[in-house]
Protein backbone atom coordinates (compact mmCIF):
# COMPACT_ATOMS: atom_id res chain seq x y z
CA UNK A 1 0.00 0.00 0.00
CA UNK A 2 2.80 2.40 0.94
CA UNK A 3 4.56 1.62 -2.37
CA UNK A 4 1.39 2.42 -4.36
CA UNK A 5 0.94 5.74 -2.54
CA UNK A 6 4.54 6.67 -3.29
CA UNK A 7 4.12 5.91 -7.00
CA UNK A 8 0.92 7.94 -7.09
CA UNK A 9 2.67 10.89 -5.45
CA UNK A 10 5.58 10.65 -7.90
CA UNK A 11 3.15 10.67 -10.85
CA UNK A 12 1.46 13.77 -9.42
CA UNK A 13 4.81 15.56 -9.14
CA UNK A 14 5.74 14.62 -12.70
CA UNK A 15 2.45 15.85 -14.09
CA UNK A 16 2.35 19.01 -11.99
CA UNK A 17 2.30 22.07 -14.23
CA UNK A 18 5.48 24.10 -14.28
CA UNK A 19 5.30 27.67 -13.05
CA UNK A 20 5.52 29.92 -16.12
CA UNK A 21 7.77 32.92 -15.55
CA UNK A 22 8.58 35.78 -17.92
CA UNK A 23 11.63 37.94 -17.27
CA UNK A 24 11.82 41.36 -18.91
CA UNK A 25 15.44 42.43 -19.34
CA UNK A 26 18.62 40.52 -20.07
CA UNK A 27 21.10 42.55 -18.07
CA UNK A 28 22.86 41.14 -15.04
CA UNK A 29 19.67 41.16 -12.94
CA UNK A 30 17.61 39.26 -15.50
CA UNK A 31 20.44 36.85 -16.27
CA UNK A 32 21.10 36.16 -12.60
CA UNK A 33 17.41 35.51 -11.95
CA UNK A 34 17.10 33.24 -14.98
CA UNK A 35 20.02 31.18 -13.74
CA UNK A 36 18.76 30.84 -10.17
CA UNK A 37 15.26 29.92 -11.37
CA UNK A 38 16.76 27.30 -13.67
CA UNK A 39 18.14 25.49 -10.63
CA UNK A 40 14.56 24.50 -9.73
CA UNK A 41 14.82 21.65 -12.19
CA UNK A 42 11.56 20.62 -13.79
CA UNK A 43 9.51 23.17 -11.83
CA UNK A 44 9.95 26.41 -13.77
CA UNK A 45 9.28 27.31 -17.40
CA UNK A 46 11.30 30.50 -17.82
CA UNK A 47 11.50 32.88 -20.79
CA UNK A 48 13.76 35.94 -20.90
CA UNK A 49 12.93 38.87 -23.19
CA UNK A 50 15.77 41.26 -24.06
CA UNK A 51 15.16 44.00 -26.61
CA UNK A 52 18.85 44.24 -27.50
CA UNK A 53 21.74 41.99 -26.44
CA UNK A 54 22.48 40.10 -23.23
CA UNK A 55 24.50 42.15 -20.77
CA UNK A 56 24.30 45.35 -22.80
CA UNK A 57 22.91 48.78 -21.84
CA UNK A 58 23.66 49.83 -18.24
CA UNK A 59 25.23 46.45 -17.39
CA UNK A 60 27.86 46.96 -20.08
CA UNK A 61 28.77 50.32 -18.55
CA UNK A 62 29.19 48.96 -15.04
CA UNK A 63 32.62 49.29 -13.42
CA UNK A 64 32.16 45.78 -12.03
CA UNK A 65 33.97 46.37 -8.75
CA UNK A 66 33.29 43.74 -6.09
CA UNK A 67 35.60 44.78 -3.28
CA UNK A 68 35.91 42.75 -0.10
CA UNK A 69 35.53 45.93 1.93
CA UNK A 70 34.42 49.43 0.97
CA UNK A 71 31.46 51.72 1.56
CA UNK A 72 29.35 50.60 -1.42
CA UNK A 73 27.53 48.03 0.72
CA UNK A 74 27.05 48.27 4.48
CA UNK A 75 28.85 45.64 6.54
CA UNK A 76 25.48 44.31 7.72
CA UNK A 77 25.17 42.90 4.19
CA UNK A 78 28.56 41.21 4.25
CA UNK A 79 26.97 37.89 3.29
CA UNK A 80 25.56 39.53 0.14
CA UNK A 81 28.99 40.88 -0.79
CA UNK A 82 30.73 37.56 -0.12
CA UNK A 83 28.16 35.49 -2.03
CA UNK A 84 28.57 37.72 -5.08
CA UNK A 85 32.35 37.68 -4.93
CA UNK A 86 32.59 33.92 -4.51
CA UNK A 87 29.95 33.28 -7.19
CA UNK A 88 32.18 35.04 -9.70
CA UNK A 89 35.33 33.32 -8.47
CA UNK A 90 33.54 30.02 -9.03
CA UNK A 91 32.69 31.10 -12.58
CA UNK A 92 36.36 31.85 -13.17
CA UNK A 93 37.38 28.48 -11.75
CA UNK A 94 34.99 26.73 -14.13
CA UNK A 95 36.06 28.80 -17.13
CA UNK A 96 38.81 31.38 -16.97
CA UNK A 97 37.61 34.77 -18.16
CA UNK A 98 33.91 33.94 -17.84
CA UNK A 99 33.46 36.66 -15.21
CA UNK A 100 36.17 38.98 -16.56
CA UNK A 101 38.09 39.06 -13.28
CA UNK A 102 41.04 41.46 -13.07
CA UNK A 103 42.77 40.81 -9.75
CA UNK A 104 44.22 44.24 -9.06
CA UNK A 105 43.51 44.42 -5.35
CA UNK A 106 41.73 47.33 -3.67
CA UNK A 107 42.91 50.33 -1.66
CA UNK A 108 40.16 51.98 0.41
CA UNK A 109 41.22 55.32 1.85
CA UNK A 110 40.15 56.44 5.33
CA UNK A 111 39.47 60.17 5.23
CA UNK A 112 37.94 60.32 8.71
CA UNK A 113 37.34 58.14 11.77
CA UNK A 114 33.89 57.02 10.66
CA UNK A 115 35.23 55.73 7.33
CA UNK A 116 38.18 54.17 9.16
CA UNK A 117 35.84 52.22 11.42
CA UNK A 118 33.89 50.84 8.44
CA UNK A 119 37.12 49.78 6.73
CA UNK A 120 38.48 48.03 9.82
CA UNK A 121 35.23 46.10 10.30
CA UNK A 122 35.28 45.08 6.64
CA UNK A 123 38.86 43.87 6.93
CA UNK A 124 37.95 41.74 9.95
CA UNK A 125 35.06 40.17 8.03
CA UNK A 126 37.24 39.49 4.99
CA UNK A 127 39.96 37.87 7.10
CA UNK A 128 37.40 35.73 8.93
CA UNK A 129 36.28 34.44 5.52
CA UNK A 130 39.85 33.47 4.62
CA UNK A 131 40.94 36.47 2.56
CA UNK A 132 43.80 38.88 3.14
CA UNK A 133 43.30 42.39 4.43
CA UNK A 134 45.29 44.96 6.34
CA UNK A 135 44.76 48.46 7.67
CA UNK A 136 47.81 50.57 6.90
CA UNK A 137 48.80 53.79 8.67
CA UNK A 138 52.38 53.84 7.38
CA UNK A 139 52.21 56.50 4.66
CA UNK A 140 55.30 55.13 2.88
CA UNK A 141 53.67 51.69 2.68
CA UNK A 142 50.52 53.25 1.16
CA UNK A 143 52.65 54.99 -1.47
CA UNK A 144 54.35 51.69 -2.28
CA UNK A 145 50.94 50.34 -3.28
CA UNK A 146 49.87 53.50 -5.12
CA UNK A 147 52.89 55.74 -5.83
CA UNK A 148 50.78 58.56 -7.31
CA UNK A 149 48.59 59.04 -4.22
CA UNK A 150 48.81 61.93 -1.78
CA UNK A 151 48.93 60.72 1.82
CA UNK A 152 48.14 64.14 3.26
CA UNK A 153 44.86 64.51 5.14
CA UNK A 154 44.21 60.77 5.43
CA UNK A 155 44.25 58.53 8.49
CA UNK A 156 45.25 55.37 6.65
CA UNK A 157 43.95 52.88 4.12
CA UNK A 158 42.59 49.36 3.96
CA UNK A 159 44.24 47.07 1.44
CA UNK A 160 43.70 43.60 0.04
CA UNK A 161 45.34 42.02 -2.96
CA UNK A 162 42.64 39.33 -3.29
CA UNK A 163 39.89 41.24 -5.10
CA UNK A 164 39.55 43.64 -8.02
CA UNK A 165 36.85 44.06 -10.60
CA UNK A 166 34.74 41.88 -12.89
CA UNK A 167 32.93 42.36 -16.21
CA UNK A 168 29.15 42.69 -15.99
CA UNK A 169 28.59 41.72 -19.62
CA UNK A 170 30.67 38.55 -19.32
CA UNK A 171 28.90 37.63 -16.08
CA UNK A 172 25.49 38.16 -17.67
CA UNK A 173 26.33 35.97 -20.63
CA UNK A 174 27.80 33.26 -18.42
CA UNK A 175 24.68 33.24 -16.24
CA UNK A 176 22.48 33.10 -19.33
CA UNK A 177 24.44 30.26 -20.93
CA UNK A 178 24.07 28.25 -17.73
CA UNK A 179 20.36 29.08 -17.61
CA UNK A 180 19.85 28.01 -21.23
CA UNK A 181 21.68 24.77 -20.55
CA UNK A 182 19.12 24.18 -17.80
CA UNK A 183 16.19 24.81 -20.15
CA UNK A 184 15.56 28.56 -20.01
CA UNK A 185 14.37 30.18 -23.26
CA UNK A 186 16.12 33.43 -24.18
CA UNK A 187 14.71 35.82 -26.77
CA UNK A 188 17.02 38.66 -27.81
CA UNK A 189 16.05 41.51 -30.11
CA UNK A 190 12.50 41.16 -28.79
CA UNK A 191 10.84 44.04 -26.95
CA UNK A 192 7.97 43.61 -24.51
CA UNK A 193 5.24 46.11 -25.42
CA UNK A 194 2.47 45.17 -22.99
CA UNK A 195 1.85 43.15 -19.86
CA UNK A 196 -1.64 41.65 -19.67
CA UNK A 197 -3.45 42.21 -16.37
CA UNK A 198 -6.88 40.80 -15.48
CA UNK A 199 -8.45 41.66 -12.11
CA UNK A 200 -5.10 43.04 -10.89
CA UNK A 201 -3.34 39.78 -11.71
CA UNK A 202 -0.66 39.04 -14.32
CA UNK A 203 -1.81 36.83 -17.19
CA UNK A 204 0.98 37.27 -19.72
CA UNK A 205 2.68 39.72 -22.04
CA UNK A 206 2.91 40.84 -25.66
CA UNK A 207 6.05 41.55 -27.69
CA UNK A 208 6.78 43.88 -30.58
CA UNK A 209 6.50 41.05 -33.10
CA UNK A 210 2.85 40.60 -32.11
CA UNK A 211 3.42 37.37 -30.18
CA UNK A 212 1.44 36.77 -26.99
CA UNK A 213 2.66 34.72 -24.04
CA UNK A 214 0.91 33.43 -20.93
CA UNK A 215 2.74 33.67 -17.61
CA UNK A 216 2.00 33.13 -13.94
CA UNK A 217 4.70 35.61 -12.95
CA UNK A 218 6.37 38.47 -14.82
CA UNK A 219 9.53 40.01 -13.36
CA UNK A 220 10.77 43.47 -14.27
CA UNK A 221 14.57 43.37 -14.51
CA UNK A 222 14.86 46.45 -16.70
CA UNK A 223 16.88 48.68 -14.36
CA UNK A 224 16.77 52.28 -15.62
CA UNK A 225 13.71 51.37 -17.75
CA UNK A 226 11.71 50.10 -14.75
CA UNK A 227 9.61 53.23 -14.44
CA UNK A 228 8.55 52.83 -18.09
CA UNK A 229 8.04 49.08 -17.74
CA UNK A 230 5.98 49.55 -14.59
CA UNK A 231 3.58 51.85 -16.44
CA UNK A 232 2.44 48.81 -18.46
CA UNK A 233 0.73 47.50 -15.31
CA UNK A 234 -0.22 50.90 -13.89
CA UNK A 235 2.57 50.77 -11.32
CA UNK A 236 4.66 53.77 -10.32
CA UNK A 237 8.08 52.26 -9.65
CA UNK A 238 9.71 54.76 -7.26
CA UNK A 239 13.18 55.09 -8.74
CA UNK A 240 15.28 58.00 -9.93
CA UNK A 241 18.04 58.09 -12.47
CA UNK A 242 21.45 59.21 -11.29
CA UNK A 243 24.18 59.95 -13.78
CA UNK A 244 27.07 57.52 -13.95
CA UNK A 245 29.60 59.58 -15.87
CA UNK A 246 32.81 57.64 -16.45
CA UNK A 247 36.03 59.03 -17.84
CA UNK A 248 39.01 57.11 -19.19
CA UNK A 249 42.38 58.75 -18.63
CA UNK A 250 45.72 58.02 -20.26
CA UNK A 251 48.34 58.48 -17.50
CA UNK A 252 51.42 60.67 -17.98
CA UNK A 253 54.10 58.54 -19.61
CA UNK A 254 51.35 56.52 -21.38
CA UNK A 255 51.70 53.45 -19.15
CA UNK A 256 52.00 53.01 -15.39
CA UNK A 257 54.90 50.93 -14.12
CA UNK A 258 52.82 49.47 -11.27
CA UNK A 259 49.49 47.71 -10.87
CA UNK A 260 46.87 50.37 -10.25
CA UNK A 261 44.46 48.93 -7.65
CA UNK A 262 40.78 49.66 -7.38
CA UNK A 263 40.93 52.95 -5.48
CA UNK A 264 38.02 53.94 -3.26
CA UNK A 265 37.31 57.31 -1.71
CA UNK A 266 33.85 58.30 -0.40
CA UNK A 267 33.50 60.79 -3.27
CA UNK A 268 34.86 58.80 -6.22
CA UNK A 269 36.53 55.60 -7.30
CA UNK A 270 39.10 54.63 -9.90
CA UNK A 271 40.46 51.45 -11.44
CA UNK A 272 42.68 50.39 -14.28
CA UNK A 273 41.15 49.75 -17.69
CA UNK A 274 43.87 48.27 -19.84
CA UNK A 275 46.60 50.93 -19.92
CA UNK A 276 44.10 53.63 -18.98
CA UNK A 277 42.45 54.65 -15.71
CA UNK A 278 38.67 54.67 -15.25
CA UNK A 279 37.28 57.26 -12.82
CA UNK A 280 33.70 57.96 -11.75
CA UNK A 281 31.85 59.82 -9.01
CA UNK A 282 30.54 57.33 -6.44
CA UNK A 283 26.83 56.55 -6.59
CA UNK A 284 26.32 57.07 -2.83
CA UNK A 285 27.60 60.64 -3.15
CA UNK A 286 24.85 61.55 -5.62
CA UNK A 287 22.14 63.96 -4.45
CA UNK A 288 18.65 62.96 -5.61
CA UNK A 289 17.54 66.59 -5.17
CA UNK A 290 20.27 67.98 -7.41
CA UNK A 291 19.09 68.11 -11.05
CA UNK A 292 22.69 67.78 -12.23
CA UNK A 293 22.96 64.48 -10.34
CA UNK A 294 19.50 62.97 -10.61
CA UNK A 295 16.18 63.10 -12.45
CA UNK A 296 13.87 61.13 -14.73
CA UNK A 297 15.33 60.65 -18.19
CA UNK A 298 14.85 58.39 -21.21
CA UNK A 299 17.51 55.63 -21.20
CA UNK A 300 16.80 54.91 -24.87
CA UNK A 301 18.34 58.27 -25.75
CA UNK A 302 21.70 57.51 -24.14
CA UNK A 303 24.61 57.62 -26.61
CA UNK A 304 27.03 54.69 -26.70
CA UNK A 305 29.89 57.04 -25.83
CA UNK A 306 30.12 60.65 -24.75
CA UNK A 307 27.14 62.57 -23.43
CA UNK A 308 29.01 63.57 -20.28
CA UNK A 309 28.89 66.91 -18.48
CA UNK A 310 31.81 69.25 -17.77
CA UNK A 311 30.54 69.40 -14.19
CA UNK A 312 31.60 65.81 -13.52
CA UNK A 313 35.02 65.83 -15.18
CA UNK A 314 35.84 69.10 -13.39
CA UNK A 315 34.76 67.55 -10.09
CA UNK A 316 36.83 64.42 -10.68
CA UNK A 317 39.94 66.30 -11.79
CA UNK A 318 39.71 68.42 -8.65
CA UNK A 319 39.50 65.21 -6.62
CA UNK A 320 42.55 63.77 -8.38
CA UNK A 321 44.49 67.00 -7.92
CA UNK A 322 43.98 66.79 -4.17
CA UNK A 323 44.17 63.03 -3.68
CA UNK A 324 46.03 61.36 -6.56
CA UNK A 325 48.12 64.22 -7.98
CA UNK A 326 50.48 61.90 -9.83
CA UNK A 327 47.86 61.21 -12.50
CA UNK A 328 46.05 64.55 -12.63
CA UNK A 329 47.90 65.49 -15.83
CA UNK A 330 46.52 62.46 -17.66
CA UNK A 331 44.94 62.89 -21.06
CA UNK A 332 41.21 62.28 -21.50
CA UNK A 333 40.82 59.32 -23.87
CA UNK A 334 37.05 58.80 -23.83
CA UNK A 335 33.95 59.00 -21.67
CA UNK A 336 30.43 57.67 -21.42
CA UNK A 337 27.17 58.38 -19.64
CA UNK A 338 24.87 55.79 -18.12
CA UNK A 339 21.84 56.05 -15.85
CA UNK A 340 21.68 54.21 -12.56
CA UNK A 341 18.28 53.20 -11.18
CA UNK A 342 18.16 54.45 -7.59
CA UNK A 343 15.33 54.29 -5.03
CA UNK A 344 15.32 57.13 -2.50
CA UNK A 345 17.19 55.03 0.07
CA UNK A 346 19.73 53.68 -2.47
CA UNK A 347 18.73 50.04 -1.87
CA UNK A 348 17.32 47.68 -4.55
CA UNK A 349 13.63 46.89 -4.97
CA UNK A 350 12.92 43.16 -4.88
CA UNK A 351 9.87 40.94 -4.90
CA UNK A 352 6.13 41.41 -4.89
CA UNK A 353 4.20 44.53 -5.88
CA UNK A 354 0.53 45.54 -5.48
CA UNK A 355 -0.10 43.79 -8.83
CA UNK A 356 -0.36 40.05 -8.19
CA UNK A 357 2.26 38.12 -10.11
CA UNK A 358 4.22 41.23 -11.14
CA UNK A 359 7.57 41.34 -9.39
CA UNK A 360 10.58 43.62 -9.38
CA UNK A 361 14.31 43.04 -9.44
CA UNK A 362 15.56 46.54 -10.02
CA UNK A 363 17.05 49.65 -8.42
CA UNK A 364 20.52 48.22 -7.88
CA UNK A 365 22.08 51.58 -8.70
CA UNK A 366 25.85 51.27 -8.70
CA UNK A 367 25.84 47.93 -6.89
CA UNK A 368 24.28 45.52 -9.36
CA UNK A 369 27.35 43.35 -9.85
CA UNK A 370 27.78 43.09 -6.08
CA UNK A 371 24.17 42.46 -5.08
CA UNK A 372 22.59 40.51 -7.95
CA UNK A 373 23.79 36.98 -7.08
CA UNK A 374 22.29 37.00 -3.56
CA UNK A 375 19.28 39.11 -4.55
CA UNK A 376 18.22 36.87 -7.44
CA UNK A 377 18.92 33.70 -5.46
CA UNK A 378 16.45 34.87 -2.82
CA UNK A 379 13.95 36.18 -5.37
CA UNK A 380 13.94 32.81 -7.14
CA UNK A 381 13.10 31.20 -3.80
CA UNK A 382 10.20 33.62 -3.33
CA UNK A 383 8.86 32.91 -6.82
CA UNK A 384 9.17 29.14 -6.60
CA UNK A 385 8.46 28.51 -2.90
CA UNK A 386 6.67 31.68 -1.82
CA UNK A 387 9.26 31.91 0.94
CA UNK A 388 10.70 35.26 1.95
CA UNK A 389 14.14 36.01 3.39
CA UNK A 390 15.49 38.86 5.54
CA UNK A 391 17.07 40.35 2.42
CA UNK A 392 13.77 40.37 0.53
CA UNK A 393 12.01 41.90 3.53
CA UNK A 394 14.60 44.67 3.79
CA UNK A 395 14.46 45.47 0.07
CA UNK A 396 10.71 45.00 -0.45
CA UNK A 397 8.68 47.38 -2.63
CA UNK A 398 6.32 48.28 0.21
CA UNK A 399 9.04 50.12 2.15
CA UNK A 400 8.99 52.81 -0.54
CA UNK A 401 5.26 53.47 -0.43
CA UNK A 402 4.37 56.88 0.91
CA UNK A 403 2.58 57.01 4.25
What spans do the regions from the language model cover?
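Short beta-strand to alpha-helix junction loop
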Residues: 79-82, 109-118, 159-177, 305-312
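C-terminal catalytic lobe of FAD-dependent flavoproteins
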Residues: 318-403
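Dinucleotide-binding Rossmann-like beta1-alpha1 core, especially the glycine-rich loop
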Residues: 64-145, 267-269
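Glycine-rich FAD pyrophosphate-binding loop
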Residues: 38-60
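Helical element adjacent to the flavin cofactor pocket in flavoenzyme catalytic cores
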Residues: 159-209, 213
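Core beta-strand elements of the Rossmann-like FAD/NAD(P) dinucleotide-binding domain
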Residues: 17-19, 208-217
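Active-site substrate-recognition segment that forms the wall
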Residues: 35-39, 64-66, 97-101, 105, ...
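Beta1/beta-strand and adjacent pyrophosphate-binding region of the FAD-binding site
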Residues: 17-29, 47
